[in-house]
């Protein structure tokens, strides 16, 4: 290896290390703002897949009770009293290809769990889809900060 090629390798390594983590990652890890802008979900690796937990609500206090929002649409009485902030939304979300996962997602708006797929659509874009029967609906989440 000549001195010049050694220098080039060192420069390339320095540039790779200097690339911001946000650009390097391109994965699902991070905090995501839902399409409606009413919640933020922290997505992180867990087990062999990914987990998603609600970390912020636009309206964290229920105006009817003056208390933190709870999972009151859940048909299971034991679960209907749990707070929305801290609620785990993903179940069994496992890799399903490059930048894709499939499993189940919980929708606190209706208290139901749906078959789901999640795909990284860009460094700051996550496509989240839920299906019941043959009907699917989805939304785009945007990477954000706490």
Tell what function each PLM region has.
Residues 1-10:
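Bacterial N-terminal signal peptides that target proteins for export
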Residues 9-18:
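Bacterial N-terminal signal peptides
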Residues 19-25:
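Sec/Tat signal peptide C-region and signal peptidase I cleavage site
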Residues 29, 35-109, 113-116:
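Central antiparallel beta-sheet cores of small beta-barrel/beta-sandwich binding domains
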Residues 46, 121-122:
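Structural motif
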Residues 108-110, 115-118, 125-139:
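Short, exposed beta-strand-loop hairpins at the edges of beta-sheets
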